[in-house]
Design a protein with these regions (language model features):
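A generic structural signal for short beta-strands and their flanking turns/coil linkers
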Residues: 97-99, 113-115, 139-144, 178-180
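Gly/Ser/Thr-rich active-site loops/lids in small-molecule metabolic enzymes
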Residues: 76-83, 124-155
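Residue-level signal for tight coil/turn positions that link beta-strands
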Residues: 52-53, 140, 211
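Catalytic core of DAGKc-family lipid kinases
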Residues: 2-119
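ATP/nucleoside-binding phosphotransfer catalytic cores, i.e., glycine-rich phosphate-binding loops
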Residues: 105, 111, 137, 147-223
Length: 223
């Protein structure tokens, strides 16, 4: 739609295995109900993202547990649903490593080694991690950025787990920001995942929030 320059409202019927974006928008996963809500709904403007010359709806991520979203065979997804991603993540455990990157986040420079990173506009990340809904606004022109490095010891692991469960993110191993634009400098061998699809790595990646760039049809709110 963006490539075509079209402003046509989009009706979205969630049919995937995880449906993170639909969960954030509170869309029905029942096909007939979703279709009826589209027919009777109203168009609402939402942010989307650009990743160099590509677009994504709700998440761009790299590192631990991100490969499974595009590497898991479709027949396994169909048979097991969300469990297929969990099993794929378990297979990735021996390959988890720290990844050196440099970032500029709305002018703030960061450099470090991270095992996971996500740029998202969703309260649910891979169905495994929930971001505090009070921190997520799909129409504010900003993404939530989460970077997680390897913990140093069991005490820091416990602190990190508590910070994720409490949705406070006040842990030395976690960096959390809300930004509208970021630039990433990395190894070109590091692939990303955009809405569950593989994006081949680049040395420099620019990610930008496209403020209210698309219109999605949603169920009308009760007066």
């Amino acid at each position: 739609m963006l490539d075509a320059g079209s402003d046509c409202p989009i009706g979205y019927i969630p049919c995937g295995s995880t449906n993170d974006f639909a969960a954030t928008l509170k869309l029905s996963t029942d096909i007939m109900t979703a279709a009826a809500e589209i027919m009777e709904g109203e168009a609402v403007e939402y942010d989307v993202g650009s990743w160099n010359d590509r677009y994504f709806s709700y998440i761009a991520s790299f590192g631990a547990f991100t490969r499974g979203s595009y590497a898991t065979p479709q027949n396994l997804k169909n048979a097991l649903g969300h469990l297929a991603y969990v099993l794929s993540g378990i297979q990735e455990l021996p390959q988890i490593r720290n990844i050196p990157i440099r970032l500029e986040l709305d002018g703030e420079a960061l450099e470090g080694e991270y095992l996971f990173g996500a740029v998202s506009n969703s309260t649910s990340v891979g169905g495994l991690l929930t971001i505090n809904p009070r921190l997520v606004d799909l129409r504010d022109g900003k993404f939530e950025v989460m970077l997680v490095r390897m913990v140093r010891d069991t005490a820091e692991l416990a602190e990190c787990v508590a910070a994720l469960q409490n949705q406070t993110y006040d842990c030395a191993a976690i960096t959390f920001r809300s930004v509208s634009r970021l630039t990433v400098h990395q190894s070109p061998e590091l692939d990303w995942t955009l809405d569950g699809e593989r994006a081949e790595g680049r040395e420099t990646i620019t990610i930008q929030n496209l403020h209210r760039a698309v219109r999605l049809v949603q169920k009308r709110e009760e007066p």
